[in-house]
Amino acid sequence: MANRTEDRKQVRCSFCGKSQEQVRKLLAGPGDVYICDECIELCYEIVEEEFDDDVAESASGINLLKPKEIKEFLDQYVIGQEEAKKVLSVSVYNHYKRVLSEKDLDVELQKSNILMIGPTGSGKTYVAQTLAKILNVPFAIADATALTEAGYVGEDVENILLKIIQAADYDIERAQYGIIYIDEIDKITRKSENTSITRDVSGEGVQQALLKILEGSVASVPPQGGRKHPHQEFIQIDTTNILFICGGAFDGLEKIVEARIGQKSIGFNAEIAHGQKENIGDLFRQVLPQDLIKFGMIPEFVGRVPVNTALDLLDEQALVRILTEPKNAITKQYRKLFELDGVELVFEEDALKEIAKRSFERKTGARGLRAIMESVMMDSMFKVPTDTSVLKCIITKESAEGKEEPRLVTAENGQQRKIAQKKVAKKSSNEIA
């Protein structure tokens, strides 16, 4: 009996070696293996720390730059819109600083989604896309006009989240740190300020449905998209750390702002209207929450996009800069395409001004530049690869106007061009092999 008691006293933790008398609890496992309460607690802490590290690793892929560095990167790709770039740089930095420091904070920081207001073609989508590229986070674009309230024909708001999951290659942890840009947000305003007995399923109903995911909640997303039904499996995603950027042209909002600040329009003079259009960015910068509510946004929605920024209407000078200055400028892209065929492409200054003028007159902004450029370049892109005597293609003002074809400079001897083409052809044949 004494020996049995002595053996029991000698039982020790198999991990730390402490005896039963030195710990509060000693649990027995198979094969005379024991673990004490202190080692259990230590194991729990290690597992929890590794789990937190895994979550942090998903977020650690975020390339968080300082606001000034973010703006400097934006400057390489986005022409003009200085105020908007500054506001977005600060807001995005604060959002991801909150995300990366969340477990170390003793004060809960609420996320600040962003509302961008600006005319068509002012660069709203492009700015949001460039921000995601800077930060190395998944990015998805959703069209608010396709959304309807649950139970009606159209897309559920959860389908927006499926797009960010797909952008992250179904890596849910990574998707939860992404950026979602909701375009045409001004098209889901309620139809009337007065309460109606009929449901507004594509206006106020969509705004109501968006509230939860904007604020942060765990949403159930159908993996194949479409409508939910009770017998399908769902993907769970937490939207707390997803940054939502909403954008829209908000046509007519400037009149609400004018009425509030006391500016009056006199008569129907077209010149006055044109002057107001040039000043539309300044008016949008004075937008207050009550202006958005009067426009048709519900107060709860306005409260969930607290950061507002305005983008200016791009004038002809800005459009010329967009054609030439950014790292991925359209003219640089076309020059590279011609260079691959061994041809030098030259744009005359007057030609660029004409292309910018046509885009400005069409009121398509930066978005319309590529379509115009494509029509100007089409004949040359069709002929030049075949005609090996062409060394240079010059886009003149007349060719930009569509009055004549681009000027082609040919060599008396096509040898130089043929050598360049042989290199390309050789590379292509090797790739095929």
UniProtKB/Swiss-Prot annotation:
Disordered as annotated region, ranges: 402-433
Superkingdom: Bacteria
Binding site for Zn(2+): 13, 16, 36, 39
Protein name as it appears in the record: ATP-dependent Clp protease ATP-binding subunit ClpX
Described function: ATP-dependent specificity component of the Clp protease. It directs the protease to specific substrates. Can perform chaperone functions in the absence of ClpP.
Gene3D superfamilies: 1.10.8.60, ClpX chaperone, C4-type zinc finger domain, P-loop containing nucleotide triphosphate hydrolases
Any one annotated GO CC term: HslUV protease complex
Sequence positions that bind ATP: 119-126
Organism: Lachnoclostridium phytofermentans (strain ATCC 700394 / DSM 18823 / ISDg)
Keywords, in A-Z order: ATP-binding, Chaperone, Metal-binding, Nucleotide-binding, Zinc
Subunit text: Component of the ClpX-ClpP complex. Forms a hexameric ring that, in the presence of ATP, binds to fourteen ClpP subunits assembled into a disk-like structure with a central cavity, resembling the structure of eukaryotic proteasomes.
Signal sequence coordinates: none
Record bears the keyword Acyltransferase: no
A single BP term in Gene Ontology: cell division
Family recorded in the similarity comment: Belongs to the ClpX chaperone family.
InterPro entries linked to this entry: AAA+_ATPase, ATP-dep_Clp_protease_ClpX, ATPase_AAA_core, Clp_ATPase_C, Clp_protease_ATP-bd_su_ClpX, ClpX_bact, P-loop_NTPase, Znf_CppX_C4
ClpX-type ZB domain sequence ranges: 1-55
A Gene Ontology molecular function term of the record: ATP-dependent protein folding chaperone
